[in-house]
């Protein structure tokens, strides 16, 4: 009886917190298996759902636990239901009901879908910067054109947009092999249109794209500034698919409202469904990405080396991948297996500008010059006092330590009285943002830089 009350309370809280579609996907599909010794065992049909439960719903489990059991209940997630008797035939029938696909049309050979098999949800690393985009992508892969249509995902280069597009397509084909799926960069779509137009084969072009169950368009910003006829054809393709309740997923390097050179009617349609952004990965996510990328390379990347690398590249995943490639090249040449910070530093030296300066500037020199400028002692800088002038000096010094040295975030934090790496990240982001808004602060920091160098 208590278990039922406990679970119903969790669902009530979840319904208040999540959107309807997110609630249907994450909460309704979950199942409470048992509560035993203050541990709630919760079945999730997909491992990717765990992060949303951890990030968004864990606290409501605790609240519900105190309400019903007068105890702190800890969740434990499982992904295989105990003694699951559901037959594969029943599962398949359920899937066929959920997906709005075209069973009468001939399926597309995988080689013609444009998808890359290596990109799946299983190997996509989730973090705070992409959790909602991943959640939306998963929802789309469960309910084609019933949840978000179109789904528009935007963010900078190297953040995983292409990976997510492919993951959606691969997931659909895993569940329904006959679904008609096409992944294509916008530039390739444009070229395909122009080729068919030149050859007088527009009917063939229309049949190819307008008979799809799922159209995945990457880098839709490439359509900006193109001729009216090109935008007109994409507009008609979009309408044809949307009217037939076929799923469309688009990615871009900017949000729909910032897409210049596109007809307003297209921009409006891009906003019909759901728009989600992906931001650069945080420190913990970068470490998880590095662990995933390095675990099968045959080298021993020490934990402090991974932390060092995660502290060096914070803009996108491609920089991390490039650094790993450089490191493994050096390791191969030197015939070594253990990757230390020294090896990593040697590898990324060429990837950093002004490294000769970065390597010789000690953090205490930065602290001294910043302290002299703002009238703050190094002891105060390393302390925890929150006076405005001390906080500013501390954050500026952390910012410059990040900009002018190749020290890892944990190392910088340690030099400021054992501060956590997240404090360094916050300080760097704060000062970087203020510099863009405050010319006086920008000039002050430039002046300090000259004294340091």
Curated annotation (Swiss-Prot):
Binding residues for ATP: 158, 160-162
GO BP, one example?
regulation of DNA replication
Query: What is the protein name stated in its UniProt record?
Result: Chromosomal replication initiator protein DnaA
Keywords of this protein's UniProt record, alphabetized? ATP-binding, Cytoplasm, DNA replication, DNA-binding, Lipid-binding, Nucleotide-binding
The family database entries (PANTHER family) matched by this protein are listed as: CHROMOSOMAL REPLICATION INITIATOR PROTEIN DNAA
According to the UniProt entry, the note on domains is: Domain I is involved in oligomerization and binding regulators, domain II is flexibile and of varying length in different bacteria, domain III forms the AAA+ region, while domain IV binds dsDNA.
Any Pfam family the entry gives: Bac_DnaA
Record CDD domains:
AAA, Bac_DnaA_C
- Where is this protein chiefly located? cytoplasm
Q: Which GO terms describe its cellular component?
A: cytoplasm; plasma membrane
Q: Please give the function described in this protein's UniProt entry.
A: Plays an essential role in the initiation and regulation of chromosomal replication. ATP-DnaA binds to the origin of replication (oriC) to initiate formation of the DNA replication initiation complex once per cell cycle. Binds the DnaA box (a 9 base pair repeat at the origin) and separates the double-stranded (ds)DNA. Forms a right-handed helical filament on oriC DNA; dsDNA binds to the exterior of the filament while single-stranded (ss)DNA is stabiized in the filament's interior.
| Start and end residues of each stretch annotated as Domain II | 74-113
Localization recorded for this chain is:
Cytoplasm
Q: Which organism is it from?
A: Streptococcus pneumoniae serotype 4 (strain ATCC BAA-334 / TIGR4)
Q: How does it assemble?
A: Oligomerizes as a right-handed, spiral filament on DNA at oriC.
Q: Name one GO molecular function term.
A: lipid binding
**Which stretches does the entry tag as region Domain I, interacts with DnaA modulators?**
1-74
Say which family it is in: Belongs to the DnaA family.
InterPro entries found in the cross-reference section: AAA+_ATPase, Chromosome_initiator_DnaA, Chromosome_initiator_DnaA-like, Chromosome_initiator_DnaA_CS, DnaA_C, DnaA_dom, P-loop_NTPase, Trp_repressor/repl_initiator
Q: Which gene encodes it?
A: dnaA
Q: Region (Domain III, AAA+ region) spans which residues? A: 114-331
Q: Where is this region: Domain IV, binds dsDNA?
A: 332-453
């Amino acid at each position: 009886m208590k278990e039922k009350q406990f679970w119903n309370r969790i669902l009530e809280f979840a319904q208040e917190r999540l959107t309807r579609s997110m609630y249907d996907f994450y909460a309704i599909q979950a199942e409470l298996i048992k509560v035993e010794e203050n541990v709630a065992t919760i079945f999730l049909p997909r491992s990717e759902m765990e992060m949303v439960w951890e990030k968004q719903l864990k606290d409501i489990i605790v609240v519900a636990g105190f309400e019903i059991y007068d105890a702190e209940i800890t969740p434990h997630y499982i992904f295989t239901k105990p003694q699951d008797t559901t037959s594969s035939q029943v599962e398949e029938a359920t899937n066929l009901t959920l997906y709005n696909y075209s069973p009468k049309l001939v399926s597309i050979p995988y080689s013609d879908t444009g998808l890359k098999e290596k990109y799946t949800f299983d190997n996509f690393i989730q973090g705070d910067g992409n959790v909602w985009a991943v959640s939306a992508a998963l929802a789309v892969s469960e309910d084609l054109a019933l949840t978000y249509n179109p789904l528009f995902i935007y963010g900078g280069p190297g953040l995983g947009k292409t990976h997510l597009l492919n993951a959606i397509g691969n997931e659909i084909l895993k569940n329904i092999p006959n679904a008609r799926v096409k992944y294509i960069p916008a530039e390739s779509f444009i070229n395909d249109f122009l080729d068919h137009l030149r050859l007088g084969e527009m009917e063939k072009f229309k049949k190819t794209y307008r008979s799809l169950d799922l159209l995945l368009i990457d880098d839709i910003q490439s359509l900006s500034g193109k001729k009216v006829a090109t935008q007109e054809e994409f507009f008609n393709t979009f309408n044809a698919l949307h009217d037939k309740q076929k799923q469309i997923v688009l990615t871009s390097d900017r949000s729909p409202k910032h897409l210049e050179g596109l007809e307003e009617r297209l921009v409006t349609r891009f906003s019909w469904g759901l728009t989600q952004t992906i931001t650069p990965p945080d420190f913990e996510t970068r470490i998880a990405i590095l662990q995933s990328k390095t675990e099968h390379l045959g080298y021993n990347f020490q934990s402090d080396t991974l932390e060092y690398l995660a502290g060096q590249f914070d803009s996108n995943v491609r920089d991390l991948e490039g650094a790993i490639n450089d490191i493994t090249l050096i390791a191969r040449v030197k015939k070594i297996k253990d990757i230390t910070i020294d090896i990593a530093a040697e590898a990324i030296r060429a990837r950093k500008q002004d490294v000769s300066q970065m390597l010789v500037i000690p953090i205490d020199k930065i602290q001294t010059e910043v302290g002299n400028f703002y009238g703050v002692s190094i002891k105060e800088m390393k302390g925890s006092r929150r006076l405005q002038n001390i906080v500013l000096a501390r954050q500026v010094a952390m910012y410059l330590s990040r900009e002018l040295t190749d020290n890892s975030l944990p190392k910088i934090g340690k030099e400021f009285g054992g501060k956590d790496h997240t404090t360094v990240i916050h300080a760097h982001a704060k000062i970087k943002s203020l510099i863009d808004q405050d010319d006086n602060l920008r000039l002050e920091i430039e002046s300090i830089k000259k004294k340091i160098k």
